[in-house]
């Protein structure tokens, strides 16, 4: 495992992926896999006896993971990068780093509404979903029951993203 910075620059990642900047990335031999859902399928192919796509629930867990990776992730971005959260953040060591990050994000999302969500809406969805998950996880070890599935991994990265600075 290689640890990389949470925010750009990520020179080791960029060299490995030829410019792809998102994480996670999986390297198996000379092959590079980008995108969580693709990586999970590749790993699942290596260990089919412990699939994170249970045969009896593959459609529902795939749909839930997609919702989590898109809608909940969008809410996570809004919650994680609200001004109040950034004020005491260790990610941004100084004002210059914060300004560079914001300029990078503006360039990355230019002309797109894919990663934007109004903060009040994001907080409402985040709180509601996390409350439901907390209740469900008080009765089972994993979102899907007794064993982890793709939804657990998709949810984990959203939580990690929001709580990275509070650990």
What are the residue ranges of the model-derived segments?
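GST-like domain detector, emphasizing the conserved glutathione-binding G-site
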Residues: 1-100
